[in-house]
């Protein structure tokens, strides 16, 4: 059944929502969660502070919505790449390319770090935080690992899970360090390191 086109009001709301998320990413990365002000986010988006509250309940709600949106974008990108693969070997290659390409985005690791610090300090948001973490890990579910590596016994699955868990922090650490060592850790250098890390973790699997 064809999707009904959005009317002008819905399109405007959608545009505002997108602009607020984009502005929020800039402010949260630059100022951190604690330092970020909704008024600054509204100004960066070219909207009023009231518009922020029309779309999000609070700064926390906006922050988590941003993280969920960006996480979903990355998961969708990976899934789309894997759908084009005809074999497990091709899927591993596609995942490797996806992982190395993470070096292009210098804001996502900082945002991820902010999110993890937020999670440590806000136990009252436990349920939503847990769901966000599960979504962040959803690219490492059983279907994904079986697509790449075939049937796994318990020991093999445990090894894969540890390797997958290590990938994200390694990217975050390298990109964070690149702000202090830009000549040593250029994007090209980081891509090279990430490729080596991936091969070390998965080639022998």
Regions found by a protein language model. Name each.
Residues 80, 103-110, 123-150, 192:
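Amphipathic alpha-helical packing segments from all-alpha helical-bundle domains
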Residues 65, 78-108, 157-167, 191:
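Hydrophobic alpha-helical connector segments
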Residues 56, 101-102, 115-121:
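Short helix-capping/turn signature of helix-turn-helix
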Residues 16, 59, 66, 70-74, ...:
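Hydrophobic/aromatic residues within well-ordered alpha-helical segments
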Residues 45-56:
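Short hydrophobic/aromatic patch on the recognition helix
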Residues 1-31, 35-44, 61:
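Basic, helix-initiating cap at the start of DNA-binding domains
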Residues 126-130, 148-205:
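Hydrophobic/aromatic-rich alpha-helical bundle segments in the mid-to-C-terminal region
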Residues 28, 37-38, 49, 59, ...:
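Amphipathic alpha-helical segments enriched in hydrophobic/aromatic and basic residues
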């Amino acid at each position: 059944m064809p999707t009904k086109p959005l009317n002008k009001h819905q399109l405007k709301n959608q545009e505002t929502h997108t602009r607020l998320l984009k502005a929020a990413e800039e402010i949260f990365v630059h100022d951190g969660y604690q330092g970020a002000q909704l008024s600054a986010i509204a100004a960066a988006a070219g909207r009023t502070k009231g518009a922020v509250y029309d779309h999000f309940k609070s700064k926390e709600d906006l922050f988590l919505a941003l993280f969920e949106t960006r996480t979903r974008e990355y998961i969708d990108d990976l899934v789309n790449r894997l759908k084009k693969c005809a074999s497990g070997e091709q899927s591993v290659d596609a995942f490797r390319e996806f992982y190395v390409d993470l070096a292009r985005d210098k804001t996502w690791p900082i945002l991820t770090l902010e999110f993890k610090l937020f999670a440590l300090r806000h136990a009252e948001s436990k349920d939503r935080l847990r769901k966000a973490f599960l979504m962040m890990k959803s690219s490492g579910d059983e279907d994904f690992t079986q697509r790449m590596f075939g049937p796994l016994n318990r020991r093999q699955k445990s090894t894969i899970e540890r390797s997958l868990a290590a990938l994200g922090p390694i990217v975050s650490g390298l990109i964070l360090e690149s702000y202090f060592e830009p000549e040593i850790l250029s994007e090209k250098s980081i891509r090279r390191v990430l490729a080596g890390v991936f091969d070390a973790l998965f080639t022998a699997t």
